[in-house]
Curated annotation (Swiss-Prot):
This is Renalase. Keywords: FAD, Flavoprotein, NAD, NADP, Oxidoreductase, Secreted, Signal. Its EC number is 1.6.3.5. The keyword Flavoprotein applies. Its cofactor is FAD. PANTHER family: RENALASE. It comes from Mus musculus. GO terms for molecular function: oxidoreductase activity; oxidoreductase activity, acting on NAD(P)H.
Length: 342
């Protein structure tokens, strides 16, 4: 039985795992490792520690799909819509700049439900808090080691973490990356920002006419979401959840600051925009070091093959463009090259 490892439990990784299970009919062990404590990557959904049913999307807020991708990725959208994983965005967003023909979608159960759906389809054995540090070539297999010192061997490895984290890996992989590939990986750049989820008491109302609001000139906050309102899941059993995301300059300026200090600043700034908000019952602050791809690999190949036999390939939106469709395109590119060589 072939052993396959996918590194990264975001959209690209989970979709690669699901497509592998679908496309490869031979017996297959499929493992998926992520260094974080939860699945989702940049589509993570946080839960209130007081009520797990009260959730907030700390990463992706909604999906925008152009007419081109509505057609190109039609099967993926139809499947997710049919299962209720995605639904059309119907609540008002103040300051949103859309293009004619664009469709917008939200995930009623939070965007991590998309990842959970694909992981369930894949049947992968998911291991969290598995931070890959080394990849060695041994006996025509990949020996993958973590920061705890544990190591396992695989016949095929797919890396879907951000490009800077690929370049940090040690072992034989260092010499397998060509100079051109190294320069391409170094050319990928990301924006950084913070997100803060705030959970409020049951019965509290936030009296604004919008579900989300973009702020064009605020020095700290660029986006506010009344998250349960955005997803159209307002309930008498859950209090409202609010997500605020910072501007990129603020994120860069405070990248090394403590999350507690950043959270305090963000709440102070929120009070100037929405005065009168009561104290939340719980808060969750998240630093996005790699928030969105601002510059991807040139020509956007969708993947980067580092070794053929055994197969080692990189995927992710750093090889396409930074959004939902970029991740789908990358997963499809990875599968295309895999089917060609295995």
């Amino acid at each position: 039985m072939s052993r396959v490892l996918v590194v990264g439990a975001g959209l690209t990784g989970s979709l690669c795992a699901a497509l592998l299970r679908k496309e490869i009919t031979a017996p297959l062990y499929l493992g998926l490792w992520d260094k974080g404590g939860d699945i989702g990557g940049r589509m993570i959904t946080a839960s209130s520690p007081h009520n797990p049913r009260c959730t907030a999307d700390l990463g992706a807020q909604y999906i925008t799909c152009s007419p081109h991708y509505v057609k190109e990725h039609q099967n993926f959208y139809e499947e997710l819509l049919a299962h209720g994983i995605l639904k059309p965005l119907t609540s008002p967003i103040e300051g949103m700049k859309g293009k004619e023909g664009d469709c917008n979608f939200v995930a009623p159960q939070g965007f991590s439900s998309v990842i959970k759906y694909y992981l369930k389809k894949s049947g992968a054995e998911v291991s969290l808090k598995h931070c890959v540090t080394q990849i060695h070539l041994k006996d025509n297999k990949w020996e993958v080691s973590t920061d705890t010192g544990s190591a396992e061997q695989f016949d095929l490895v797919i890396l879907t973490m951000p490009a800077p984290q690929i370049l940090e890996l040690q072992g034989d992989i260092v010499n397998l990356i060509s100079e051109r590939q190294r320069e391409q990986l170094k050319s990928v750049s990301y924006s950084s920002r913070y997100a803060l989820g705030l959970f409020y008491e049951v019965g509290m109302k936030i009296g604004v006419p919008w579900s989300c609001r973009y702020l064009s000139s605020h020095p700290c906050i660029c986006f506010i979401s009344i998250d349960n309102k955005k997803r159209n899941i307002e309930s008498s059993e859950c209090g409202p959840s609010v997500v605020i995301q910072t501007t990129v300059p603020f994120g860069v300026q405070h990248l090394e600051a403590s999350e507690a200090d950043v959270q305090k600043l963000m709440i102070q700034q929120l009070e100037t925009i929405l005065p009168g908000l009561p104290q939340p019952v719980a808060t969750i602050c998240h630093k996005w070091t790699y928030s969105q791809v601002t510059s991807s690999v040139s020509d956007r190949p969708g993947q980067m093959t580092l070794h053929l036999k055994p197969f080692l390939v990189c995927g992710g939106d750093g090889f396409t463009h930074s959004n939902f469709n970029g991740c789908i395109s990358s997963a499809l590119s990875v599968m295309k090259v895999l089917k060609r060589y295995i």
